[in-house]
Amino acid sequence: MLRTIVTKIFGSRNDRILRRLNKQVRIINKLEAEFELLTDEELKSKTTEFRTRLKNGEKLENLIPEAFATVREASKRILGMRPFDVQLIGGMVLNNRCIAEMRTGEGKTLTATLPCYLNALTGKGVHVVTVNDYLARRDAETNRPLFEFLGMTVGINVPGLSPEEKRAAYAADITYATNSELGFDYLRDNLAHSAQDRFQKHLHYALVDEVDSILIDEARTPLIISGPAEDSSELYMAMDKLIPILIQQDKEDTEEYQGDGDFTLDLKNKQAHLTERGQEKIEQWLMEKGFINENESLYSPARISLLHHIYAALRAHKLFERDVDYIVKNGEIVIVDEHTGRTMAGRRWSDGLHQAIEAKEGVQIQGENQTVASITYQNYFRLYEKLAGMTGTADTEAFEFQQIYGLETIVIPTNKPMIRDDRTDIMFENEKYKFDAIIEDIKDCVARNQPVLVGTISIEKSELLSNALSKAGIKHNVLNAKFHAQEAEIIANAGYPSAVTIATNMAGRGTDIVLGGNWKAEVAKLDNPTEEQIEAIKAAWQIRHETVKQAGGLHIIGTERHESRRIDNQLRGRSGRQGDPGSSRFYLSLDDALMRIYLTEGKLNFMRKMFTEKGEGMESKMLAKVIAQAQAKVEAHNFDGRKNLLEFDDVANDQRHAIYEQRNTLLDNEDIAETIQVIRQDVFNHVIDEYVPPHSLEEQWDIPALETRLKQDFALDLPLSKWLEEDNTFNEDVLRERVLAVAISEYKRKEELVGQEAMRNFEKGVMLQTLDELWKEHLSAMDHLRRGIHLRGYAQKDPKQEYKKESFQMFTDMLDTLKLSVITTLSRVQIRTQDEVEKAEQARQKIAERENAAMQYQNNEGTSSLHEKSEHKIGRNESCPCGSGKKYKHCHGSKAKY
């Protein structure tokens, strides 16, 4: 109450920020007349002037009025569009490390040119981030003439580019790119084996379009570069046959309740849980099929991988639906984004789920992969010095943007008042009655020439409604993941009089629906259109446009509420753009997923009793309150999940940052000899400590074991026992000095043979290869730790603290292993002179001749062994004459026949 009174008097923080920015807008507007008098050349020269002023120490913020005035004037001349005052405000918000909420149709693409131009003046590069390559290309090509007029270069970074094209894209002043390609390039850069193979030089300023989709909806999706792992496709097929014999029960067993099923489902988290009866049934089945021995537990350490496959199969069958969560296309499982309804080609679920779904659908099971490098969008975009974003729906997630990314959300007012009629939700007893009412509403709109956009939450629902409309004889278009290729054309026609379009949640987002249809799309279809043709198309469009406006504009129908209010607002936001008329209404039923999952059985039963007549709809404030509570529950649950993920990933992120920083230092340095020397000293001290404890008595020393270790791991054959006997002054410090001196001397001898440059390159190669291999293994170990860490809670321990503690220990162990492996490899490598190489080649040829003779003898005599031996027989345990340093039986002797 008090807050409301104070806000009325002083205004909200959003209002105060807008008032402050309006002062800047007035300054920019005053410059307009002056800039209109500039010639094209004078306007272009402003870019050089601004860059010079920045180099001379002027702050970027001081350039805002003139830079924005420059872009506005250039936009008028090149694009034929003048940015509105609210777009100038949006541009300033985006420059201030904030999120600008701008309604659909308010010109976000043009608004973005203002902060992009300003920040590109620094020469550090600007990345404009979009959700797909179509939007990246479209926005880049739309704004390219403007930026190039002002002397800025524009690049496009999308999947499928050659290294040269990608390098050119990143070298541009302003780069349009997809979020996934930026993230994968970052990971690929940190797997590169030379500095020249890296693409991303500097992460300076990122402007994220549809920021809620990327930083909220995609936050829990890690970007992963993976390599092949062990094939277990047969196991997935076997476990797939187990699922049909299992019985589901409604809720988990408790002291008060004991069900008779084998498993329960957690629909909120998409997880399955086995009951004790289920475990016993599965163990019996596994024994019968020979997967486990009698009396062996499913939870024994040796069989834990079986449990992994069982849970994957259970989730695949019971929690993931075809044409809802995925589609089958060309014999492959393609994931459908639950938020956008778009297919995500190339994406795969982890934890064996994708393989389990492949087994379920009877398509080829592709091998599991081992993670080589990974990062979440949350942590990738926090790497930028300056981050901003824009979307039509951010205010509902403002708290999360502030908490996770430190980004404040500013709601930008519309250029014209929004007059859309958002009608009260209407509830039905079941889905059939709801669909009947939707079809009646659509019939009414079609009769009045009003276009309709119907939003569904899945492909399955869109096809159900499509069938119902077809039966009713209503012409319509369907836009979902199955008809993705026709997206642009369907959206272009969605504003025609009486047009009916069914779309999954946000499929087609990023493209406005123009009342009367998109006349520009019609013109684009023509080859070399004449002025007369263009004018005729415009005139026809104007008639259609007025017809649709008179009918009430675009009518939005939501077939059910989404888990998130933001997704509902995105659907509504399709209508009422730039002051156009429009309307919206959501049709709900008690069968809807949101109701079933998030409302108690008691509430559902109470609501069922409120329906007294068949097929009647119900509108009430209480209903709106119930839905709002359900959505608030889901949003809080999802926020907690993303926050929890970030807290765990931050641990890995600190380690990732340390490793990648070290790796980039290695790539940038031509000479790492000093680093190797420091590591060598550390490794030898550590090894000697194992056998000669610091400050210990001579009797505690294990010299024979140390001699063996030095010979095996470092190829150093040192008479330590003899040194100890002959030298009375021989102590721990002398031992360390002598061992290290011999190691360095031996290493320098090798260096003299091959030359400094070759040795430096070899050192760098060994260091990088070892680091990459150990980091890959570490990621796998961290993943296993993460999966099981929640069990520590049963021991009254904080899983997060335990994860931090154990992962840190694993990280330090990995670094110790890295040092040891690098020095071991460098110490054991054998350097051969040209003379030795020639001798080895002669020995190899002799072996080849003997092998050929053996083959010839076998062919001629039909016997399995050759009795005559030529000259000297090489012993199986002797060194191979090829010079590899391996025993003959493990090298060329493995091929020779005796």
From Swiss-Prot:
It is found in: Cell inner membrane; Cytoplasm. Its EC number is 7.4.2.8. Coiled coil: none annotated. One of its GO terms (cellular component) is cell envelope Sec protein transport complex. May bind 1 zinc ion per subunit. Residues 866-876 have a biased composition (Basic and acidic residues). Its main location: membrane. Its cofactor is Zn(2+). SUPFAM superfamilies: Helical scaffold and wing domains of SecA, P-loop containing nucleoside triphosphate hydrolases, Pre-protein crosslinking domain of SecA. Residues 886-898 have a biased composition (Basic residues). Residues 855-898 are annotated as: Disordered. InterPro entries: Helicase_ATP-bd, Helicase_C-like, P-loop_NTPase, SEC_C_motif, SecA, SecA_CS, SecA_DEAD, SecA_motor_DEAD. It catalyses: ATP + H2O + cellular proteinSide 1 = ADP + phosphate + cellular proteinSide 2. SMART domains: SecA_DEAD, SecA_PP_bind. This is Protein translocase subunit SecA.
